[in-house]
Structures are given as structure tokens and as C-alpha cells.
Amino acid sequence: MDYLVGIFLLLCGVALPGRVAPQHTKENVPRLKLSYNEMLESSNLVTFTGLANSSGYDTFLMDGERGRLLVGAEDHVFSFDLVNINRDVKQIAWPATPSKRDECKWAGKDLRKDCSNFVRVLQSYNQTHIYICGTGAFHPICSFLEMGKRAEDNIFRLDANYFENGRGKSPYDPKMQSSSLLLDGELYSGTSADFMGRDFAIFRTLGSHHPIRTEQHDSRWLNEPRFLGIHLIPESDNPEDDKIFLFFKENAMDGEHTGKATISRIGQLCKNDMGGHRSLVNKWTTFLKAKLTCSVPGLNGIDTHFDELQDVFLMSAKDPKNPVIYAVFTTSSNIFRGSAICMYSMADIRRVFLGPYAHRDGPNYQWVPFQGRVPYPRPGTCPSKTFGGFDSTKDLPDDVITFARLHPAMYNPVQPMGGKPIVVRTNVEYQFTQLVVDRVEAEDGQYDVMFIGTDLGTVLKVVTIPRESWHDLEEVVLEEMTVFREPTPITAMELSTKQQQLYLGSDLGISQMPLHRCEVYGKACAECCLARDPYCAWDGTECSRYFPTAKRRTRRQDIRNGDPLSQCSDLHHNDDLEGYSSVEERSVYGVENSSMFLECSPKSQRALIYWQLQKPNDERKHEIVIDERLSLTGQGLLIRSLTQADSGVFLCHAVEHGFIQPLRRINLQVIPSQRVGELLLRAGTNDKDPAPKHKLWYRDFMSLLEHPDLNSVDEFCERIWKREKKPKGKKAPKVNPGTGVSIKNEKTPQTTAQSLQNPTQRAQNAPKVPNNPSVQIFPKSTGLQRSQSPGGTVSTESQSTKPDTQKASESQRAQPNQAKKGPQTPQRGPPHTAKWKQLQENKRGRNRRTHEQQRPPRSV
């Protein structure tokens, strides 16, 4: 019977999301989003903040045998422990010489940004040494790092006795993008070879052979390239056929594109190329290049192109001759910003290099496929016994060399697998910068998990899941993590499958994070299954790391479908089909005609929120219809102008991938506004202090109250202040001893401000009132009494004398005693509100003239 319950739940899970018609499935949204502080607090991030006098931590070399990560930066080389980068940190200072810095400054370069030694080459030379090169303040320099044979040797030092010119190995300009690869003692590098940055070339240096490079100052070969990666890919089982593949972007060739445009390329050359005999001497004779295309097909054949290559990652396969190539692209436009990731197969790349060459008859002609005779052996073919039987490129016929020099480009572009990108991002704040991929073995197959770095210092963890075929992939964003304290572009990434760690570099420093955080997905089987993370599975008690070799039948994982109903047995044997037995009910109160916000936010950002209302004495659950009065936000449900019909139990569901999970059960009770008004009026007329519960009532509902009996907030506050300030013993108002009429103690703004001063200041600044009670007190409307003098109009307050001041003080001290004898006349009602408004306006400097006229005279 369990399977019948499962089918029933599955049908309910499919039917309910259909009723959430206004919403659509959240695509390209990370399921979890972790901030920098959350990563640190959960011990999922280790950071090295770098040195104050160093930056540019973007040259990585993974040394798995010694368990170290080598990082080249400005004037320094670092060695980090792969387990924890903050443990056993080693560093070597390698600054540029003062004379080179001075020359760099005199050449017009920025002393702080350019005239340092930025390490740009870190390549393993042998078992004990690392070949290292830096910009050297626009004077490239190279040397060796001694590491020792084993990690226990604990050796990390720079060979101070060996330095050589780094021209053709390291760029002059630290901002210039370059790549290098060291194979069999020979260094292959793509870089610029002059101070001005105009001579771009692909070099092969070191070793026993003569240095070799691409044709110089020929835009058909290279046109201001920026190199992003160099890799060795075998062509056959014969090592003589091995080829070097380069990934770069350059300006479009003349006639290739209207206007100035950036073209992404893949280039190839033979590892055993020795140059030509009479032509192309010490130049590559097997160099070919082709365009890499990454675009989204559009209507009427108009595609959206991502032109600028940013990074490349080769995912090795069982057959080393056919790795899968992942490439990161961005748009060239400043108006439309987007990023994409495309996959390429070596079969498609080889097919393009075996296709037609690009050709044009003159500068005024279009590029067309070459239709003439192609010489033998085909240009681009490596000299070996497998293809052609030539022992060296120096033995190639002259027509082959001439054709290769005039036709370095292929006509057809390399199309991505599936004809479109596997990941696309547009209309977002960030762009992709770096990429590494890990192939993970899961319960239902292998999956490639991508870790994508952005220019805001965040990392996206994305898995592609095949739907009908491997060419139709579903993109699932598992996590988005902030790995640097400030937004900064991620410029380097390395992945260690042995340590299960990811290492990231930027201008701010180095960060390290694990590849998986299974515990953050939740504490339930359904949450772990819905995550669809190939690294994680439910082991019966928690979401933990999945190991394919573990012989545990309780492991539950479903990456392809993400269906908890088929994996989590507790959902089948639970009598509570809706799952609300485990959800705690919360009671909240609202006032009629006010607003109420019911908070409910799912842990997963991919989940959709679905609300139901169960009214009192009604077992049915009614769907919440979103309208002008009800608004659904990412954090909950906002109800404007509560009514009695809103009372009841609100049920909040999370709908994700066809599965419905209850989140909250909120019991809302709506209080009639008339009832609240009666309570407030009763509290206002009661002479005793209100009960504590009445104060809580007032404080809970004050922000939402819209009672008709209270004309303004000022009147409301006046009532509350009077009730709070009323002393325990009732005092009688002041009485004029001569007339027996009670005089209200009305303070002017000036006396109110004086009451805030210390007693001495209050005595000095007190208004001067005559001691004789029969003296006439001028009303406020008469203003200041003035007398005429020969010198002009003089205010009477300037004619007051010192004895008058003393008498006024004595009169003020005597008034409280006199006031006790008079009758008590309590004052309540609107006059207090009017005075409070006038007091506030006078404090803000308004109606100053009225204030001067209404102030009583200080002396007579």
C-alpha cells in the first residue's frame, strides 16, 4: 500500500503547483545563497588576506605531490598548504631592482601599479625545481625555485645564482594576459615580446632546440591577441603527433568583421615543429587557428553572440585524445552585459582543422573558403610516420610552407556541443571570469559540477543534468557563495580532487572552500534529495557526503529527477499526508482596517510559496488569491486593511520540483477596531495607572491603529504623556491670591527651554514678576509694553532694576505655597493638543513674531 500513498502524494504534488498560475518556475536561481560571513561562521571558508605591499594573486601552480599550492603575486612567491592555506605559509620576496624601477618610471609607467615584479610564469621544471618568471618592472626576468624532492625536505628558496632574460616567456606589462606551458624542458608561451606591447607571438624557448615563434607583424597570424590557456592534447597513440592547443582572443582580421570586433580563437601547432628550411626559418610551420563560436540561436537566424573568451577548462576523459573543453565567454557590448559557458568536443575541433582554409584574393575582397589545390602533406599535419612519412618540418616541400604562411586561418568556426551554451546569464550584476569543473560519481551516473567565478568575488556551483539526451541539458544552480570580503574579480581558480577543496585568487588575496557543504541543505531527507547535489546523499540520519564505494543501502540520492517521494521512506509511512504535524502553529493578532505581514520564507530560493486559509469551524482550505489587497513577497504575505473574514489559520507551503513541503501554520485573529477604541478610551479616562496588559495592548497596536475618535497622533500622544506623567498625589493648580481665580501654568517656549537648564541658570533667566499681587499682568495679546524716550522706543525690560529681579525670584518661590490653598481644577482635552503643536512649531523657529508678541513682559 505504500506505493499507492506515494502515487497519491505525487498526484497532489503535481496538481497543487498548477494552481500557482501567476508564478513561473524560478530558473537560473541558486538554491542556496551564502554570504561571506555565513561562509566564515559555518567554517566553510579560509582566507589569506595577503600582504600590504603585494597584490595580484592570480598565477597558480598545484603541486599535489608535496601538497602545496604555489602562488605568484607582486614582488612575492607564496607556498600554501593544500589542507589549510593559513597553516605553514611560506613566502619569498622577489622585488624588481631599484635601477629597473627607476627606468620603468622614467619610461612613463605608473611606479606603484606597473613598476614591480609581477610573477606571471610558474611551471614545474623537474622533481626539485620550479621555473619562475616575472615582469621585472617592464624588464622580464626568470629564475628557478628549489622545492626539494619530498615535502619533508621543507625547502623553498629562490636560486640567487641563476637569472636570465625573460623576453618571450613573461609579458612586459603586468596587465597583459599571457599563458605558458612547460613540457619536456621546453617552455611554450603566448605573450608580448617588446616594451611597447606590439610584438605578440607564440614562443618555444628553453631546451636544446633553437627558439621558435610565430610570424612577426602579420595580422593574419596574430592580431593583438590575449592568451588564456595552453594545453597538450594527443592526436594519436604516436607521441610524434602530439599537438599544442592555444586558446586566445584577438581583434578581427581585416575584412573578417565590420568595424573593430573581438574574435575568440583556438590555435594548434605541432609539438615537434622545428620551423622551415628556406621559408619560415625558426617560425612555426604547422600553426593554424579557428574561430570559437558561442551564441544563442535567435529568430530569423539572428543569434546573440558571446564574443570574448575569458577562461578555458579541459575535462579529461577516459580517452586522453578526446577531452571535453569548457569555455567561458562574455559579451563585448557595454550596453548588453552577459556571460555564457559553452562545451566543445575534440572531434568537432579536428573536423574544422581538416576543413577549408580561409582565403581572400586582396584587401578589397571577402574571406571565402579556399577552392584551389591544397598541397601535400596537408598544412598543419605533424611530421611523423603516421601521416606522410616526413621526419621533420624542415623536410616539408616549399609549397606546403608557402601555403601555411599565407593561410593560417580556417574558414569554418567551431560550434559548441548542442549548438548553444549550457549556461547563460544576462541582466545580472556580475559576469563570469573563471571556471573549473569536477566530474562526480553519483548514484545514477556521472555529473560535471562547474564552479564559476565572477567579477564580484562570488562563486556559482552549477550542475548540468541531461533530460532526454546528453545534448539536452538542464542547468541547476546549487549554490552562490561570496568568498571575498569585498567585491573583486576572481582571477585564478584551482581544484584539488584529492583534498576536495577549491582555491581562488584575486587582488585581495587567496580563499579556500570545500567542494561540498551537505549539512547546509537541511535536516530532512526531502531537503537533501531536492538539493540535487551529486556530492551529497541522505544516509538515514543526515545529509552527508556521498561515496560510491560505500555499501550502505540507506543512501538516498536522485540527481536526475530530484524526487523525494521515491527516495524518502518517511514520506510514505507518515499518516499525516500534509505534513503539518511537524509544523508548530503560531498565533498572531491584528487590528481591523490595519495591515499585517505573515512571514514565511523557504530555505531554498528555487521554491515557490503557496498560501491557503482555513477559516474557523471549517475543515476546508481555501486558496489565497493575490489581488490589490493581498501581496505576495519573497519573505511572506502582506495583507492590507484587515477584515474579520481574514481570521483563521494561514498555511504556508513551499513548492519545489513538484514536491510540496509545509513551512508555517499561522493562526491570525483579527481584533475589531471598535473594541480597541473602547480599551483606549477607557484607559484615557481612568485616573489610575493602566494595567500592564493595557500598556502592552497599546504598544502592540499603536503602529497599526487608525481609530476615528483620535483626530491626530498629537492628541493621542498628549493623552499618553499626561497619563504617564501624572504624579501619585494630586496637586492643585496655581491660584491668584487676590482674586481666587486659578491660573494655568502656561509656559512659553523660552521658559520651556529654560526648564531644561540647571537650577542656577533657571534662576538667572527667570522672568521678572513684581512681588505685589495687585500688579496688573498684561495679557498675551498686548505684546511687549514700550515707553517713549528721547532716544527712541525702548523696551521696558531694559529698564528693570536689580531689586526687581530679587523680588521676582522671591515671588516665584512663594507661588507654589500659595497655589496649594486654591481649589483643584484639572485640565484635559484639546487645549493641551493645541499648545503642544504651538510649542513644537516655536521650537522649530516658526511664528517667531507671534511668539515675541505673546511672551509676557519680564518687568513692569
UniProtKB/Swiss-Prot annotation:
A biological process term (GO) from this entry: cell migration involved in vasculogenesis
Annotated Ig-like C2-type domain residues: 579-668
User: Does the keyword field hold Transferase?
Assistant: no
Specify residue ranges for compositional bias: Polar residues. Answer: 748-764, 782-818
One GO MF term attached to the UniProt entry:
neuropilin binding
**Matching SMART domains, A to Z?**
IG (SM00409), PSI (SM00423), Sema (SM00630)
Q: What Gene3D superfamilies would the database entry show?
A: Immunoglobulins, ligand-binding face of the semaphorins, domain 2, YVTN repeat-like/Quinoprotein amine dehydrogenase
Q: Which InterPro entries match?
A: Ig-like_dom (IPR007110), Ig-like_dom_sf (IPR036179), Ig-like_fold (IPR013783), Ig_sub (IPR003599), PSI (IPR016201), Semap_dom (IPR001627), Semap_dom_sf (IPR036352), Semaphorin (IPR027231)
What ranges does the record list as Basic and acidic residues composition bias?
838-860
The protein's location, in the record's own words, is: Secreted
Q: Which UniProt keywords apply?
A: Developmental protein, Differentiation, Disulfide bond, Glycoprotein, Immunoglobulin domain, Neurogenesis, Secreted, Signal
Q: Where do the record's region annotations for Disordered lie?
A: 725-860
- The lineage's top-level taxon is Eukaryota
Q: Which residues form the Sema domain?
A: 31-515
Question: What cellular component GO annotations does this protein have?
Answer: axon; extracellular space; glutamatergic synapse; plasma membrane
Using the UniProt annotation, give the residues that carry a glycan (glycosylation sites). Answer: N53, N126, N593
Q: What the protein does? A: May influence outgrowth by a variety of growth cones including those of the posterior lateral line ganglion.
Q: Which family does it belong to?
A: Belongs to the semaphorin family.
Record-given protein name:
Semaphorin-3aa
Gene encoding the protein: sema3aa
